[in-house]
Amino acid sequence: MSDVNIRLECLRPAERWVQPTGAEIREVLHLAGLTGGQAARILGLGAKGDRTVRRWVGEDSPIPYAAWAILCDLAGIGAIWKGQG
């Protein structure tokens, strides 16, 4: 099991959301059972989408909230855009 914890502030609705670290993005991809290329296809990122995912994981580019929220849902974390209760 991974030692990476995903901070709660990364699992909030967009208006209160904090950008995840590259390690947190990598952990969500792992939990979802996805490679960067698979995630790129699911997210509709186009022909060079795997490069985009690598840039998110490498913290060279911020991940958009919508992409993060979809990945969290695929990872079984839930629909973070709905918030709690």
Curated annotation (Swiss-Prot):
Keywords: DNA-binding, Plasmid, Repressor, Transcription, Transcription regulation. One of its GO terms (molecular function) is DNA binding. Residues 28-47 bind DNA. It comes from the Bacteria. The keyword DNA-binding applies. Acts with KorA as corepressor in the control of the kilC and kilE operons. This is Transcriptional repressor protein KorC.
